[in-house]
């Protein structure tokens, strides 16, 4: 057992170039940071479960760097012979290199007879089977948490094996063994999932995760990205310190999280990273600042930004045969105001993969913005034939129908999008707004109430409920929604004025 943790990440980064869910940026260079040659996927659905367990085919890196073993300095070659990939010892002997067999390789610890269930990997590294034949173990090496399964729908090793039992049985069995989690409500995964569902009341808790140096860097990066995606006002405060982090992954997440910050302010924040030493960070900065008007910059900044854009286009050009890269180029050119180049990139993405729904949606939006509504609508109908159950496609068709003045068709499309939406609330919220605006305010309030019960703490939903309830004369309910709204961000003076006005009217 190592007395002091290894702080050199070169071995794990070398393995991660193949054993990670990633995109390629450049050629391999020994000793270079992984992010200097690859773009990593964060711990977001649908790639990972809400608690960070593997879900899609994400390989090993993303799960392993979450583990306590990684934080303690364990590296790949401690368990695997790097050339043959054979384990260092058979069975539980791999774990016994560090963990005392008398304490852990015993029925007193694992509560199973010798055989299935008594192997360390059975409980701490459950396998997921891909393509029907490829069993891959989750390398986050975690303790089974049926309590989280009950609230998050995440898997656990107990019911993965005992498929005839449920999570409540597993939870009670662990309690009978004296194992009882006391952090179900406050667990980082639970808090983060609430924010993913639109509950901004937990934004402060997610900000605390971002700042918590005891959490794995990949989890902190994921938390910061989620905070940015949520539109929470705390993102700037959370991201600013990490723009100068010594950990490239955290700098990358900080850049990504600022996408909704006004462009001029964003440039001021990201200006020191125009020449960041790590390529993935520079690529993220380039994409984030693509919309900066060069004529507003001083000469030195404009030249630095143009160099960065040239590098971005050169790197992307090396992978131009990938539809995802063409999609990114479309977004980049669109942000720069170059519609012909953006259209060409989106059409090339569709030539490479005619099933790529995001390219259909982005191209349709570009055509609409250019006054080509009929072409945009035809493209969306084509996307619907490809993906008839896509909520995003139905949502876009609903908005197109509203612009065309066809309220009946718009409500049909938006209702379909709302029915198909997962953890997000956007489609259901817009459907409710459409109900209100097209003459059914009571239906809108019913839809918003149901949404607020399922995903409480969303400011847009609460604001609409406050206003629509007041319109219908339900002043006490409206005042309650406004009060909850203010509790999410007391700094918002417009929300405070609304609360005070509705509270006075309800008296």
Model-identified regions with their sequence ranges:
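Amphipathic alpha-helical scaffolding segments comprising HEAT/armadillo-like alpha-solenoid repeats
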Residues: 200-210, 232-244, 262-273, 296-313, ...
């Amino acid at each position: 057992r190592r007395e002091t943790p290894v702080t050199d990440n070169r071995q794990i980064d070398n393995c991660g170039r193949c054993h990670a869910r990633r995109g390629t940026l450049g050629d391999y260079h020994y000793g270079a940071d992984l992010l200097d040659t690859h773009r990593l996927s964060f711990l977001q659905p649908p790639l990972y479960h809400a608690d960070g367990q593997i879900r899609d085919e994400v390989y090993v890196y993303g799960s392993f760097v979450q583990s306590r073993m990684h934080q303690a300095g364990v590296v790949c070659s401690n368990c695997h012979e790097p050339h043959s990939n054979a384990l260092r010892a058979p069975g539980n002997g791999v774990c016994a290199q560090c963990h005392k067999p008398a304490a852990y390789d015993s029925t007193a610890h694992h509560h199973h007879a010798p055989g299935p269930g008594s192997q360390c990997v059975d409980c701490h590294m459950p396998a997921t089977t891909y393509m029907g034949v490829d069993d891959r173990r989750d390398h986050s090496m975690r303790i089974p948490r049926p309590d989280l399964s009950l609230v998050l729908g995440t898997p656990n090793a107990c019911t993965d094996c005992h498929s005839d039992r449920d999570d409540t049985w597993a939870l009670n069995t662990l309690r009978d063994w004296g194992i009882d989690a006391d952090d179900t409500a406050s667990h980082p995964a639970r808090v983060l999932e609430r924010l993913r569902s639109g509950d901004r009341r937990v934004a402060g808790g997610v900000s605390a995760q971002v700042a918590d140096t005891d959490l794995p860097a990949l989890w902190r990066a994921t938390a910061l990205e989620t905070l940015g995606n949520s539109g929470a006002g705390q993102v700037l405060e959370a991201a600013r310190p990490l723009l100068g982090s010594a950990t490239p992954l955290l700098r990358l997440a900080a850049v990504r999280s600022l996408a909704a910050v006004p462009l001029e302010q964003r440039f001021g924040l990201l200006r020191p990273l125009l020449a960041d030493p790590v390529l993935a960070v520079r690529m993220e900065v380039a994409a984030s600042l693509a919309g900066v008007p060069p004529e507003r910059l001083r000469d030195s900044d404009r030249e630095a930004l143009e160099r960065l854009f040239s590098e971005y286009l050169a790197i992307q050009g090396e992978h131009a045969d990938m539809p995802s890269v063409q999609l990114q180029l479309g977004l980049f050119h669109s942000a720069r105001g170059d519609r012909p180049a953006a259209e060409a990139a989106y059409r090339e993405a569709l030539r490479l993969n005619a099933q790529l729904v995001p390219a259909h949606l982005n191209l349709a939006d570009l055509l609409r913005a250019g006054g080509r509504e009929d072409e945009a609508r035809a493209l969306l109908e084509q996307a619907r034939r490809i993906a008839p159950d896509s909520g995003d496609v139905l949502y876009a068709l609903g908005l197109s129908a509203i612009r065309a003045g066809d309220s009946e068709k718009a409500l049909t499309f938006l209702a379909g999008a709302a029915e198909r939406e997962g953890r997000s609330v956007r489609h259901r919220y817009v459907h409710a707004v459409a109900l209100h605006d097209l003459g059914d305010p009571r239906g809108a309030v019913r839809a918003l109430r149901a949404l607020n019960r399922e995903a409480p703490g969303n400011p847009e939903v609460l604001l609409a409920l406050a206003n629509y309830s007041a319109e219908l004369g339900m002043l006490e309910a409206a005042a309650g929604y406004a009060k909850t709204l203010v509790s999410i961000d007391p700094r918002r003076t417009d929300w405070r004025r609304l609360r005070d006005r509705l509270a006075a009217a309800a008296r």
